[in-house]
Swiss-Prot record:
Keywords: Coiled coil, Cytokine, Disulfide bond, Evasion of host immunity by viral interleukin-like protein, Glycoprotein, Host-virus interaction, Secreted, Signal, Viral immunoevasion. Plays a role in masking infected cells for immune recognition by cytotoxic T-lymphocytes. Down-regulates the expression of the host TAP1 gene (transporter associated with antigen processing), thereby affecting the transport of peptides into the endoplasmic reticulum and subsequent peptide loading by MHC class I molecules. Inhibits IFN-gamma synthesis. Transmembrane segments: none annotated. The keyword Disulfide bond applies. Glycans are attached at N127. Belongs to the IL-10 family. This is Viral interleukin-10 homolog. GO terms for molecular function: cytokine activity. The keyword Nucleotide-binding does not apply. One of its GO terms (cellular component) is extracellular space. Homodimer.
Length: 170
């Protein structure tokens, strides 16, 4: 009886820990997920880019370099968390007409994060990214303008995600 219970528990643990995307179909669905992100962003892009009065880029080349380097995993994870926890909640409150679209964009980003975690080769990380820390500091210094800046550059973020996933897929 005890042995069966142990074997059953081991099987359950393996099923729980095994990535959902063990087959290639689900791990290869990232291009469609990026298209969905771009499509969702296109619904609010004009609103946020017209309100963005800051000339300097928030998402600098150093972030892309982190994405391409050994910190890629952590940089991507931190940036997704940054957008989901700091940028999007504030962006939803900028315009009632944009709220649902920003919410939809956030849901697409959450889905992507979940899929990346389940396809472990894309997010096996634990280090900190200096570029992300700099972005967060610049964002906070911009105060209310930071929302428009971060949201107006979301397409750059999607491009960086795509670059990261292209490298990891090799």
């Amino acid at each position: 009886m005890e042995r069966r219970l142990v074997v059953t528990l081991q099987c359950l643990v393996l099923l729980y820990l095994a990535p959902e995307c063990g087959g290639t179909d689900q791990c290869d669905n990232f291009p469609q997920m990026l298209r969905d992100l771009r499509d969702a962003f296109s619904r609010v892009k004009t609103f946020f880019q017209t309100k963005d009065e800051v000339d300097n880029l928030l998402l600098k080349e150093s972030l892309l370099e982190d994405f391409k380097g050994y910190l890629g995993c952590q940089a991507l994870s931190e940036m997704i968390q940054f957008y989901l926890e700091e940028v999007m909640p504030q962006a939803e409150n900028q315009d009632p007409e944009a709220k649902d679209h920003v919410n939809s964009l956030g849901e697409n980003l959450k889905t992507l994060r979940l899929r990346l975690r389940r396809c472990h080769r894309f997010l096996p990380c634990e280090n900190k990214s200096k570029a992300v820390e700099q972005i967060k500091n610049a964002f906070n210094k911009l105060q209310e303008k930071g929302i428009y800046k971060a949201m107006s550059e979301f397409d750059i973020f999607i491009n960086y995600i795509e670059a990261y996933m292209t490298i990891k897929a090799r």
